[in-house]
């Protein structure tokens, strides 16, 4: 009877996740769309959860050594994208790799470089500057224009531009946008608009600003409202440029800056400019008095810097030009108070400061009408010291010795040699 009961009951064999799971190769996984990949991941995760819930009541049996070797060979041969072994249910949306825990998936998508590991073990992989695995990879591309994106959300947001689909709208003005982030960015424009009470108070100051702005053509004013940019930043305190208005308190976290293509026209001619500085430079042409005019040659320069760069100081001897007086004096004096240059000596002879004549830059000594040679100041002083030592107290380079005085005799007294020329 026991044998009949055993034969009547069907044989129960354990079912593993590998028997139920459906795997794809790398080529098959690339042909799947994003929606098919998402559906596949959801189905496989539910299947794995059901199997783990049923198998949790019984203690899992240890697999044999042959089964372990077979699983290891299959894991090595299978690629990381699309092939699921062992029942993971957390998937990477970029490459399709699967993980058992959510933390493993997070570490796979956002690997962090460990500073402690870099210090303790500089030869490790992370210590050498471990990069993210998906950095620079853009697997999702648009079929219309070919642009690539890192995730499916960016691709879906881009497709709305081709289809003209703008589901989000502004609650105040009704303008439509592609996503909520653009709506939130657009709402800051409405928040920075002044109230009705402030508009009446600022009307006078706005008229002052308009009066100072040069006249523009109405054609150039038309596209000014199309270029609006919002600059986010801390609370700022701004002041109107070139106006007598008081400072403007900006109490919001963003400042609206209107980009305009207005061209400022010259009031004296029909030339237009995009920058006020260019207009001010151009207005110097219409002035009666020429700006940056040199006091000597009466020539006007484009700017004061150009006037400063001119070499207006020239040497009267060698015709060398310099920018300042200091450079000219350094040239004449050779930057030394004792050693004078040839130009300074020639100029001194021409002006009468030096007694020795100079011809063509060569200094030479000549004799006067009586036939005597002209002595220099140093030579005359030395001769006067040797002739009258009592008054001067000096003889040559040193002090006068007692035996050198008048009336003294000494065998070792020095003999002064007079110049015999």
Swiss-Prot record:
Induction: Up-regulated by LIF. Down-regulated during differentiation of embryonic stem cells, or during retinoic acid-induced differentiation of F9 cells (at protein level). Regulated by JMJD1A, which mediates histone H3K9Me2 demethylation at its promoter, thereby activating expression. Disruption phenotype: Affects the maintenance of DNA methylation imprints. The absence of just the zygotic function causes partial neonatal lethality, whereas eliminating both the maternal and zygotic functions results in a highly penetrant embryonic lethality. In oocytes, its absence results in failure to establish maternal methylation imprints at the Snrpn imprinted region. Intriguingly, methylation imprints are reacquired specifically at the maternally derived Snrpn imprinted region when the zygotic Zfp57 is present in embryos. GO terms for molecular function: chromatin binding; DNA binding; double-stranded methylated DNA binding; zinc ion binding. GO terms for cellular component: heterochromatin; nucleus. Residues 191-221, 371-421 are annotated as: Disordered. SUPFAM superfamilies: beta-beta-alpha zinc fingers, KRAB domain (Kruppel-associated box). Expressed in oocytes and in a subset of adult tissues. Expressed at high levels in testis, and at low levels in cerebellum. Present in sciatic nerve and spinal cord (at protein level). Keywords: Developmental protein, DNA-binding, Metal-binding, Nucleus, Repeat, Repressor, Transcription, Transcription regulation, Zinc, Zinc-finger. This is Zinc finger protein 57. It comes from Mus musculus. Residues 15-88 form the KRAB domain. Residues 195-207 have a biased composition (Low complexity). GO terms for biological process: autosome genomic imprinting; epigenetic programing of female pronucleus; epigenetic programming in the zygotic pronuclei; genomic imprinting; negative regulation of gene expression via chromosomal CpG island methylation; negative regulation of transcription by RNA polymerase II. A zinc finger (C2H2-type) spans 90-113, 140-162, 168-190, 264-286, 313-332.
């Amino acid at each position: 009877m026991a044998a009949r009961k055993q034969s009547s009951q069907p044989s129960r064999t354990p079912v593993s996740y590998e028997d139920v799971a459906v795997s794809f190769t790398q080529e098959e996984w690339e042909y799947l769309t994003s929606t098919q990949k998402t559906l596949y991941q959801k189905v496989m995760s539910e299947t794995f959860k059901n199997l783990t819930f049923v198998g949790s009541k019984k203690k899992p049996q240890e697999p044999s050594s042959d089964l372990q070797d077979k699983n290891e060979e299959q894991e090595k041969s299978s690629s990381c994208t699309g092939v699921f072994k062992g029942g993971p249910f957390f998937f990477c949306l970029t490459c399709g790799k699967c993980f058992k825990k959510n933390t493993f998936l997070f570490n796979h998508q956002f690997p962090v470089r460990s500073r402690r590991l870099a210090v303790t073990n500089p030869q490790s992989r992370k210590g050498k500057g471990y990069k993210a695995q998906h950095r620079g990879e853009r697997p999702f591309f648009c079929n219309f224009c070919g642009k690539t994106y890192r995730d499916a959300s960016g691709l879906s947001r881009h497709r709305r531009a081709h289809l003209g689909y703008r589901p989000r709208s502004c609650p105040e003005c009704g303008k439509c946008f592609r996503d909520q982030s653009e709506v939130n960015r657009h709402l800051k424009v409405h928040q920075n608009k002044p109230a009705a009470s402030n508009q009446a108070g600022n009307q006078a100051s706005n008229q002052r600003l308009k009066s100072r702005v040069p006249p523009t053509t109405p054609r150039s004013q038309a596209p000014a409202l199309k270029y609006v940019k919002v600059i986010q930043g801390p609370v700022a305190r701004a002041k109107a440029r070139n106006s007598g208005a008081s400072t403007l308190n900006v109490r919001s976290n963003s400042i609206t800056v209107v980009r305009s293509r207005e061209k400022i026209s010259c009031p004296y001619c029909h030339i237009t400019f995009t920058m006020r500085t260019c207009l001010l430079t151009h207005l110097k042409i219409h002035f009666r008095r020429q700006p940056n005019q040199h006091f000597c040659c009466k020539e006007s320069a484009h700017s004061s810097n150009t006037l400063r760069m001119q070499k207006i100081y020239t040497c009267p001897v060698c015709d060398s030009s310099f920018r300042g007086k200091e450079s000219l004096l350094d040239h004449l004096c050779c930057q030394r108070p004792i050693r004078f240059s040839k130009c300074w000596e020639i100029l001194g002879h021409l002006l009468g400061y030096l007694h020795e004549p100079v011809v063509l830059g060569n200094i030479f000594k000549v004799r006067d009408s009586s036939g005597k040679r002209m002595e220099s100041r140093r030579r005359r002083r030395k001769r006067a010291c040797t002739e009258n030592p009592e008054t001067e107290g000096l003889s040559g380079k040193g002090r006068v010795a007692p035996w050198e005085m008048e009336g003294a005799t000494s065998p070792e007294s020095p003999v002064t040699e007079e110049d015999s020329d």
